[in-house]
């Protein structure tokens, strides 16, 4: 289910016209892409479910790298990403979404006027019936 979630999440984010300012949205950090780019930095899953439905709890960290020398320069884009992730439709190929929860974020300045932001979410998924 973890790989199904990763694929669905990337496709969902890439399909949003409000995120058209992002040069590439990839499953992993792109090897050579001009910022801004968005990728899955990491994911991990554990067993989760209910009495009658098996599932997984999956944590996904998304990384946005952008060019800006302002601390809040990428804030509007991060807000759009957050809203889009939380709006992921519940019925997907390979799983049914039970819940999404924002866990934490980190932001840092990097060399050459680059900024990086990490957004971490918890997804609880049911296996398909």
PLM feature spans:
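Mid-chain, well-packed structural core segment of small domains
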Residues: 65-90
């Amino acid at each position: 289910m973890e790989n199904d979630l990763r694929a669905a999440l990337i496709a969902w984010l890439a399909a949003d016209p409000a995120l058209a300012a992002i040069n590439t949205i990839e499953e992993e950090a792109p090897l050579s892409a001009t910022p801004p780019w968005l990728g899955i930095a990491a994911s991990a899953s554990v067993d989760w479910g209910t009495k009658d439905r098996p599932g997984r709890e999956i944590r996904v960290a998304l990384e946005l790298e952008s060019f800006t020398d302002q601390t809040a320069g990428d804030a509007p884009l991060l807000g759009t990403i957050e809203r889009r992730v939380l709006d992921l439709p519940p019925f997907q190929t390979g799983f049914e979404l039970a819940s999404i929860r924002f866990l934490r974020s980190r932001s840092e300045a990097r060399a050459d006027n680059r900024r990086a932001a990490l957004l971490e979410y918890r997804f609880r998924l049911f296996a398909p019936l």
